[in-house]
Curated annotation (Swiss-Prot):
This is DNA ligase 4. It is found in: Nucleus. One of its GO terms (cellular component) is nucleoplasm. ATP binds at residues 271-274, 278, 331, 345, 367, 427, 432, 449, 451. Mg(2+) 2 binds at residue 427. PANTHER family: DNA LIGASE 4. Keywords: ATP-binding, Cell cycle, Cell division, DNA damage, DNA recombination, DNA repair, Ligase, Magnesium, Metal-binding, Nucleotide-binding, Nucleus, Repeat. The lineage of its organism: Eukaryota, Metazoa, Chordata, Craniata, Vertebrata. SUPFAM superfamilies: ATP-dependent DNA ligase DNA-binding domain, BRCT domain, DNA ligase/mRNA capping enzyme, catalytic domain, Nucleic acid-binding proteins. It comes from the Eukaryota. Residues 654-743, 846-912 form the BRCT domain. Interacts with XRCC4; the LIG4-XRCC4 subcomplex has a 1:2 stoichiometry and XRCC4 is required for LIG4 stability. Component of the core long-range non-homologous end joining (NHEJ) complex (also named DNA-PK complex) composed of PRKDC, LIG4, XRCC4, XRCC6/Ku70, XRCC5/Ku86 and NHEJ1/XLF. Additional component of the NHEJ complex includes PAXX. Following autophosphorylation, PRKDC dissociates from DNA, leading to formation of the short-range NHEJ complex, composed of LIG4, XRCC4, XRCC6/Ku70, XRCC5/Ku86 and NHEJ1/XLF. Interacts with DCLRE1C; the interaction is direct. Interacts with APLF.
């Protein structure tokens, strides 16, 4: 019977190979529109097959979910964790395929992040595995999408039950019945990173216009696929529901200087920013559920009823007797009843895994309420939600508490609160607008956060030595993306340190250019790290690098972090929380890094917290936004790493002297004319090839603007020319003069030359122009004048207003608004215009103050304004469901009040 029901699903009939070939096409497509087309074709064929399979049956639960959970595995919540990462998969493949341990293919799998040969797939385990598996696998697999999901369910459940032999058995079934291409995508599904080049929001939007919004309030992919199966049918009400996890509202990083402006010059709440785990609690009588910010269910830990868990038994009686149903949002904290203090997350404990007999106890700190007795409160203001929250339960110290807040109005009060948080060793502060409504998965809609590390000058920074490295993945493949940093043992007086203790691993804070430059500087010094024979100068904990560098060849980096916390992963017995590189200390020698004594002194200074200074506000000491410290540049000769060495051109026969003694740097070619072919032809014409442009380089040839080309352009030292110019030279066997159509970038001297030879549209002053060139010039003129209509000039005007601080003028308060007014008896029917209505004057007011007023309601409209007659509000709400970007429906008073007061008013109080 079960088999019969299973076969009545689309997933039971669709080969897994079809999904994989679709994913392969999506990934290989360069244009976003092409990627979307491939996904839509697969989705449409699924829906057609679904209609044919189920005909007109009602209450069909079959949906696109079996495919969607494989396409967006990072959103999977039903299936438990696989407990498998790349290294474990590599070992499993070696064992299951019986590969020799020291063989070439086994080492490829184990060292997948290490660059080798000419391939550019370093760091992409799935691609490495594909080439290892290709000669050993079926040409085409036999599994359906349904069968793949069933086997992955077994992998997850057996991993949860710690039955490794059964995990291997399920994986073996997948391997023996799949092609190499299918396994490439299986690996990505297991690792939960498909690298498709399109976001999950794009995928959900293609599936259904309401999919993103529904997922934000449910985090349930199966529910999204089932309820929104028909793209023509929308949901009338998408809101937070009981026992359905939603994505919580988030806070944006605040600039202390802008707080008053961000809060609309009105009073605001200041709360302590808690350092725990964001958690939502759903309660219905004696039934409880707890969900994390990512939608994971932690009910087993905290308690599904008053008889079980680390929290529910202690808080059940705290709720008022008339409160049966509620949804709360807050932070799960660890409370020490002995010291009556909350523990910081950096200390060695996990609130989600604390046992009942622990010295610490679970405490739920609540700061918001979203439902009480089936009354949904998300659309209520924060002020009203706070009032309701205070009457929902009676706080119990150390078990369930309400986060305290205070009302403030100035940035001085914000600074005082931040300094107080620093003194108390707290994470920071939250700032919330009393009129803000709750918006799932939105950041900064009236909620702000300030942490000491966001403000320059408040943190102690550490000068650490790089002693190890880790190969990167994805866009950082083939280069070091993370570094192992250390402090020195204090040497005898007058000597340099010889032993270093590891402290932390850091992989953020730098741009791709800074990472690339640092990689070039250290490239020739990296050595493989062998765990059995580690270098005597570098002492590690359990965390070992993939490669190491002799300290005397390394550089010091300045690290900023939140605090120093205990850790047995590093030799110092401590590590840094949230470390990031601020700058490379080119002004310091390798032996001038921090010592163990310096580290211990810093750790004892403020119980490990690195924020020890106060923020001051005054005429000469304004609080400043966080800025990247300028990296001091040091003149250096850039070396050439192995895979950038020039090609062997010794066998090339010269056919012309057109490029005699001319030096070129070819970055990339074109379709049909790859980089190597262009280099060979240049050599045939007598030219020289270099891989990095220098002072003697005539020009850089680039078929596309990758990161290296962009860096060359930003240096403004070399001309960057399209390969088409080279092809023209090869064709005519002459050095064709440069023309504007060949140029990607011009250095200052070339710009001056072109200014003398050509007008601003690329038309030569001295050389006759042919028909094709004239067409090209006319196209340029068209582009230059494209911002001519008032609508098209609006963003240009807005930019000018912002640049010269005119955006504070009341005359441009509606500049970013596109407004449709309720002037028509039938929406979008201009022939049904209502005569002699006050909204005509309102439309003029809007235009006068910068708004774009439209007569057609469509995608891109930001506001709909309703007059005294509100009979069409429900029609507008129905229409809004058909749009991807939702407009706000406001009373006319929002416009008139804003104009009267000379500034935009808070929209929430005018919503309909």
């Amino acid at each position: 019977m079960a088999t019969s029901q299973t076969s009545q699903t689309v997933a039971a009939h669709v080969p897994f190979a079809d999904l994989c070939s679709t994913l392969e096409r999506i990934q290989k497509s360069k244009e976003r529109a092409e990627k979307i087309r491939h996904f839509k074709e697969f989705l449409d064929s699924w829906r057609k097959f679904h209609d044919a399979l189920h005909k007109n049956k009602k209450d069909v639960t079959d949906s696109f979910y079996p495919a969607m959970r494989l396409i967006l595995p990072q959103l999977e919540r039903e299936r438990m964790a696989y407990g498998i990462k790349e290294t474990m998969l590599a070992k499993l493949y070696i064992e299951l395929l019986n590969l020799p341990r020291e063989g070439k293919d086994a080492l490829k799998l184990l060292n997948y992040r290490t660059p080798s040969g000419a391939r550019t797939d370093a760091g992409d385990f799935a691609v490495i595995a594909y080439f290892v598996l290709k000669p050993r696998c079926l040409q085409k697999g036999s599994l359906t999408i349904q069968q793949v999901n069933e086997l992955l369910d077994l992998v997850a459940s057996n991993n949860s039950g710690k039955r490794k032999d059964l995990v291997k058995k399920s994986l073996l079934q997948l391997i023996t019945q799949s092609s190499a291409l299918e396994q490439k995508w299986l690996i990505r599904m297991i690792i939960k990173d498909l690298k498709l080049g399109v976001s999950q929001q794009t995928i959900l939007n293609i599936f259904h216009n309401d999919a993103v919004e529904l997922h934000n309030v449910t985090t349930d992919l199966e529910k999204v696929c089932r309820q929104l199966h028909d793209p023509a049918v929308g949901l009338s009400d998408i809101s937070i529901t009981l026992f359905s996890a939603f994505k919580p509202m988030l806070a944006a990083v605040a600039d202390v200087e802008r707080v008053e402006k961000d809060m609309k010059q009105q009073s605001f709440y200041i709360e302590t920013k808690l350092d725990g785990e964001r958690m939502q609690m759903h309660k219905d009588g004696s039934v409880y559920q707890y969900f994390s910010r990512n939608g994971y269910n932690y009910t087993d830990q905290f308690g599904a009823s008053p008889q079980e868990g680390t929290l529910t038994p202690f808080i059940h009686d705290a709720f008022r007797t008339d409160v049966q149903v509620c949804i709360l949002d807050g932070e799960m904290m660890a409370y020490n009843p002995t010291t009556q203090t909350f523990m910081q997350k950096g200390v060695k404990f996990d609130i989600k895994r604390m046992v009942e007999d622990s010295d610490l106890q679970t405490c739920y700190c609540v700061f918001d309420v979203l439902m009480v007795n089936n009354k949904k409160l998300g659309r209520e203001t924060l002020r009203k939600r706070y009032d309701i929250l205070n009457s929902t339960f009676t706080p119990i110290q150390g078990r369930i508490e309400i986060v305290q807040k205070k009302l403030a109005q100035t940035k001085n009060e914000v600074v005082d609160a931040l300094n107080e948080a620093i003194d108390k060793r707290e994470e920071g502060i939250m700032i919330k607008h009393p009129l803000s409504i709750y918006k799932p998965d939105k950041r900064g809609e009236g909620w702000l956060k300030i942490k000491p590390e966001y403000v320059s000058g408040l943190m102690d920074e550490l000068d650490l030595l790089i002693v190890g490295g880790y190969w990167g993945k994805g866009s950082r493949g083939g280069m070091m993306s993370h570094f192992l940093c250390a402090v020195a043992e204090k040497p005898p007086h007058g000597e340099k340190p010889s032993v270093f203790h590891t402290l932390c691993r850091v992989g953020s804070g730098y741009t791709m250019k800074e990472l690339y430059d640092l990689g070039l500087k250290l490239a020739k010094y990296w050595k493989p790290f062998h765990k059995k024979s580690p270098p005597s100068s570098i002492l590690c904990g359990t965390e070992k690098p993939e490669v190491y560098i002799e300290p005397c060849n390394s550089v010091i980096v300045q690290i900023k972090a939140a605090e120093i916390v205990p850790s047995d992963m590093y030799k110092t017995g401590t590590t840094l929380r949230f470390p990031r590189i601020e700058k490379i200390r080119d002004d310091k020698e390798w032996h001038e890094c921090m010592t163990l004594g310096d580290l211990e002194e810093l750790r004892g200074k403020a119980s490990g917290k690195l924020a020890t200074k106060h923020l001051h506000v005054g005429d000469d000491d304004e609080p400043r936004e966080k800025r990247r410290k300028p990296v001091s540049k040091m003149k250096k000769t850039i070396g050439i790493i192995e895979h950038l060495k020039a090609p062997n051109l010794s066998n090339i026969s010269k056919v012309s002297n057109v490029f005699e003694d001319v030096e070129f740097c070819v970055m990339s070619g074109l379709d049909g004319y790859p980089k190597s072919d262009l280099e060979n032809r240049i050599a045939e014409f007598g030219g020289y090839i270099v891989q990095n442009p220098g002072p003697d380089t005539y020009c850089v040839i680039a078929g596309c603007e990758n990161i290296r080309v962009k860096n060359i352009i930003s240096s403004d030292q070399h001309d960057v020319v399209k390969p088409e110019w080279l092809l023209e030279c090869f064709k005519t066997k002459t050095c064709v003069p440069w023309q504007p159509r060949f140029m990607i970038h011009m250095c200052p001297s070339t710009k001056q030359h072109f200014a003398r030879e050509y007008d601003c549209y690329g038309d030569s002053y001295f050389v006759d122009t042919d028909l094709d060139q004239l067409k090209e010039v006319f196209l340029g003129i068209k582009k230059a004048g494209e911002h001519q209509t008032p609508e098209e000039m609006a963003p240009v005007i807005a930019d000018l207003e912002y640049r010269y601080s005119w955006d504070h003028s009341p005359l441009c308060m509606f500049r970013h608004c596109t407004v449709y007014l309720d002037l028509y008896a039938v929406i979008n029917d201009s022939s049904s215009k209502i005569k002699a209505t006050r909204l005509d004057v309102t439309a003029l007011e809007l235009r006068f103050h910068g708004a774009k007023v439209v007569s057609h309601l469509s995608e891109g409209v930001s506001h709909v304004i309703i007059g005294e007659n509100q009979s069409r509000v429900s029609d507008f709400k129905v229409f809004r469901r058909t749009l991807k970007k939702k407009f706000k429906i406001l009373q006319e008073r929002w416009v008139t009040d804003s104009v009267d007061k000379g500034e935009l008013q808070e929209e929430n109080q005018y919503l309909l």
